[in-house]
Amino acid sequence: MSDISYREINANGFWHNNPGLVQLLGLCPLLAISGTVVNALGLGLATTLTLVASNVTVSLIRHWVRPEIRIPVFVLIIASVVTAIELAMNAFFHELYLILGIFIPLIVTNCAIIGRAEAFASKQPIPKALADGLAMGLGFTCVLVALGALREAVGHGTLLADAHLMFGEAARGFSLTLFEEYRGFLLALLPPGAFIALGLLIALKNIIDARLQKRQPAQAAVPVEAAG
């Protein structure tokens, strides 16, 4: 693992080992908060910051932490980072903080974060640990935002309806109304709808992977004409 390239790190985080689509970790906040794009983006960025900060810190102290106590130390680091992020969100994005509620401190229990600290950051130098945290966090955020966009569009007929919660009053104009006089679809906003939407995203990824795998043998089977 020590010779893993940055390209492989990015590919794993965004696609091959995506926390939301492949590992299926952090499903509680993934399904509960992804009702709108803004809520999903807020939680995704908070998770990304946690992954980056905890990965870098774990990599920095990896030579000084005894193996017997590494897990409690990693959890303490993650909890400290999440507490700082929670206080910052309460101060600067208070309305969004009230909506996300308990799911911000619950980031501490996200298995993807402790998993990356244990499996990757504790064995890698700081630059690669940072890259892994960024790739995994942004990959998770992309899934959250895609799920939020799908549920908000089907459930409310809008996109970015609460953009001002994150980007300020100037962002009220960002809201898009996709369907005029749309009465909404309640199922998309409930937990069963979240499971269905996530299942559709996973199915789409599997279809893309299957088609890519079919192309590779076909390309390898093409004979190479001899020169001359």
From Swiss-Prot:
Any one Gene Ontology BP term: electron transport chain
InterPro entries documented for this protein: NqrDE/RnfAE, RnfE
EC nos: 7.-.-.-
Entry annotated with the keyword Nucleotide-binding: no
Major enzyme class: translocase
Topology in membrane: Multi-pass membrane protein
Gene Ontology CC entries for this record: plasma membrane
Signal peptide, first to last residue: none
Keywords in alphabetical order: Cell inner membrane, Cell membrane, Electron transport, Membrane, Translocase, Transmembrane, Transmembrane helix, Transport
Domain of life: Bacteria
One matching Pfam family: Rnf-Nqr
Subcellular location: Cell inner membrane
Membrane-traversing stretches: 24-44, 73-93, 95-115, 130-150, 184-204
Function: Part of a membrane-bound complex that couples electron transfer with translocation of ions across the membrane.
HAMAP family per UniProt: RsxE_RnfE
Subunit: The complex is composed of six subunits: RnfA, RnfB, RnfC, RnfD, RnfE and RnfG.
Family to which this protein belongs: Belongs to the NqrDE/RnfAE family.
Protein name (database record): Ion-translocating oxidoreductase complex subunit E
Gene field: rnfE
